[in-house]
């Protein structure tokens, strides 16, 4: 059994051609199409079928159901990502008042960095949620590392922060040396960083370790001076670059790109706060309130992670060209990448049993600047008879039907340095 329309793991080596070539590879085999659907309503199936029909390489089938009830797929345009999070949180609360359980609702994102806005909004409104397939945003290792740098810049007395990042990235400061520093600090009632300042002028540690620690202290002092006159989010970008943390993630071909996207989202979210102190207090509050959810919780996950699952109500945010479909996928594999992205959209829509909500933002904050986005071409491929559109004043729900994304993420991102060039802003 296989479904060419749900082949979404090309980046893992899964070949949709294996299904498309089946009749050639096994001549005489009988093909049985399973087209009757018992999960979704006719409007959801109609929208999904109309969307996937735009793919050139597929065997072709039309899903149908006897269930003619249910709402049309709702397509909403909003001003920016934060407005999108507010909209979906409001829709969740409305559905809950109508008797829908939290666990019967899911938010399916294209990229993990999108989760941050929804997590923070849900915490603020005391909406229980669970991130499926990975840790919550502020619990991710790269986010905790970044926060540890900020906390140590803000306060030399934060020994937990010191212990976390004194050798991240690797500086040649081994665990034995770190434990010796912490022991000495406790023995003399000092902070770990104060103890280091004394140790680097003695011969109690190896010369190589003392040099590494001296460089670390010098970097911290420089970043602390920078924080006195520079916006805190720019300080964060500088720390990630100068510490070697960004380069460490670039070297990780398995998950480094995802971590860099999360760090990018982190620096952008910091811009909503006037000071570093205010930001860190906000993080502490969110972490304190976010004690984990019980069984009845909104499910947040990536579209890839949602394959095989189903929910009565599904929210599909971020349907903007360049974000979804992913510009990187299209750049890497062209039409094949676009078609796999479309299959991913099809999977997302068909996770919904009763209601599906698609949303797109007119603006996304990128590298400290607002970037104008256009609705995903997938929005324009949804059959009108199966959707209900609603946009904020001045926003359009109709995308420009271009491959590279004229005016959207595809072109606007080109004006900024990619993470291949670090956390830069517009090139000079």
Label every model-predicted segment.
Residues 1-20, 36-40, 239:
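Conserved helicase NTPase motor core
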Residues 5-10, 39-40, 130-154, 166:
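Short alpha-helix plus adjacent loop in nuclease-associated cores
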Residues 8-12, 19-20, 45-46, 50, ...:
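Metal-dependent catalytic core segments for phosphate chemistry
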Residues 18, 84-91, 145, 265, ...:
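Well-ordered alpha-helical segments embedded in enzymatic catalytic cores
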Residues 27-30, 35-128, 151-155, 187:
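Helicase P-loop NTPase motor core
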Residues 33-34, 127-136, 358:
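RNase H-like polynucleotidyl transferase catalytic core
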Residues 101, 115-127, 140, 147-389, ...:
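Conserved helicase C-terminal RecA-like lobe
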Residues 382-428:
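Acidic, low-complexity intrinsically disordered tails
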């Amino acid at each position: 059994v296989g479904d060419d329309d749900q082949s979404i793991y090309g980046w893992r080596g899964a070949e949709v051609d294996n299904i498309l070539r089946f009749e050639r590879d096994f001549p005489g085999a009988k093909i049985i199409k399973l087209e009757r659907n018992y999960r979704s309503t006719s409007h959801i199936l109609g929208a999904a079928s109309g969307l996937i029909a735009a793919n050139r390489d597929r065997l072709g089938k039309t899903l149908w159901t006897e269930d003619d009830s249910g709402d049309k797929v709702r397509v909403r345009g909003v001003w920016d990502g934060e407005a999108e999070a507010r909209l979906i949180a409001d829709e969740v609360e409305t559905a809950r008042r109508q008797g829908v359980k939290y666990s019967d609702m899911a938010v399916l994102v294209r990229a993990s960095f999108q989760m941050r806005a929804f997590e923070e909004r849900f915490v603020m409104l005391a909406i229980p949620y669970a991130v499926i397939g990975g840790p919550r945003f502020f619990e991710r290792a790269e986010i905790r590392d970044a926060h540890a740098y900020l906390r140590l810049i803000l306060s030399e007395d934060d020994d937990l922060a010191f212990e976390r990042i004194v050798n991240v990235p690797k500086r040649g400061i081994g665990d034995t040396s770190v434990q010796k520093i912490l022991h000495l600090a406790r023995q003399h009632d000092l902070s770990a960083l104060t103890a280091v300042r004394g140790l680097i002028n003695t011969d109690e540690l190896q010369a190589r370790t003392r040099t590494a620690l001296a460089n670390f202290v010098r970097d911290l002092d420089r970043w602390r001076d920078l924080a006195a006159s520079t916006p805190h989010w720019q300080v964060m970008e500088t720390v990630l670059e100068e510490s070697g943390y960004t380069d460490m993630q670039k070297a990780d071909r398995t998950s480094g790109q995802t971590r860099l996207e999360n760090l990018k989202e982190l620096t952008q979210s910091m811009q909503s706060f006037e000071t570093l102190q205010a930001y860190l207090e906000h993080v502490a509050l969110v972490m304190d309130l976010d004690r984990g959810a019980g069984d009845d919780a909104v499910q947040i996950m990536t579209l890839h992670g949602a394959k095989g699952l189903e929910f009565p109500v599904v929210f599909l945010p971020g349907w903007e060209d360049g974000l979804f479909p992913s510009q990187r996928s299209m750049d890497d594999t062209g039409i094949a990448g676009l078609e796999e992205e479309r299959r991913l959209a099809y999977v997302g829509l068909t996770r919904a049993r009763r209601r599906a909500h698609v949303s797109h933002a007119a603006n996304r904050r990128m590298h400290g600047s607002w970037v104008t986005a256009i609705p995903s071409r997938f929005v324009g491929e949804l059959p009108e008879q199966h959707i209900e559109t609603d946009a904020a004043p001045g926003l359009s729900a109709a995308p420009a039907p271009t491959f590279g994304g004229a005016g959207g993420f595809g072109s606007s991102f080109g004006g900024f340095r990619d993470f291949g060039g670090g956390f830069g802003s517009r090139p000079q």
